[in-house]
Amino acid sequence: MNFLAHLHLAHLAESSLSGNLLADFVRGNPEESFPPDVVAGIHMHRRIDVLTDNLPEVREAREWFRRETRRVAPITLDVMWDHFLSRHWSQLSPDFPLQEFICYARKQVMTILPDSPPRFINLNNYLWSEQWLVRYRDMDFIQNVLNGMASRRPRLDALRDSWYDLNAHYTALGTRFWQFYPRMMAQASHKAL
């Protein structure tokens, strides 16, 4: 899962959206640095990552990547799941339009920015103003995201080529998303994540 899915599942679970978004920028035990609700959100994010990586649908999708891109498949798939969520938001969350959800999420996240790591602050400078969560629905933007990550982290250069795997298996990836994501939504609503 990437930014949008973590925020969405956190909302459904009535968990801290701030903590769920912040989690990838926090190493180790967060309990001494953040309030309890944010810590709970960080832990939820980590559980979702482990759960998602071990889903049979996700394990199967990783196998569709070529040998030279399989190492970065988990990262690529996380971004792709956000693509499908953004693209199909109105079906998955018909009572909360995406733009309204984004405003709601941003307000929550802004409350923790003053005490956040610099990299997280930097992310927030772009995430909201450049409308990433809406733009995830566009596959050209997904390609730009993967290229950007590869540029910032040279050891992840294979992300550039992983775009071809997404394109080659687009329909099958969409099918897998619809198989697992509604289940995760139900788990979140029942606070079982």
Curated annotation (Swiss-Prot):
It catalyses: holo-[ACP] + H2O = apo-[ACP] + (R)-4'-phosphopantetheine + H(+). Pfam families: ACP_PD. GO terms for biological process: fatty acid biosynthetic process. Disulfide bonds: none annotated. It is an enzyme of class 3 (hydrolase). Keywords: Fatty acid biosynthesis, Fatty acid metabolism, Hydrolase, Lipid biosynthesis, Lipid metabolism. The keyword Lipid biosynthesis applies. InterPro entries: ACP_PD, ACP_phosphodiesterase_gpbac. GO terms for molecular function: [acyl-carrier-protein] phosphodiesterase activity. Belongs to the AcpH family. Converts holo-ACP to apo-ACP by hydrolytic cleavage of the phosphopantetheine prosthetic group from ACP. NCBIfam families: PRK10045.1 (NF007466). This is Acyl carrier protein phosphodiesterase. It comes from Shigella boydii serotype 4 (strain Sb227). The gene is acpH.
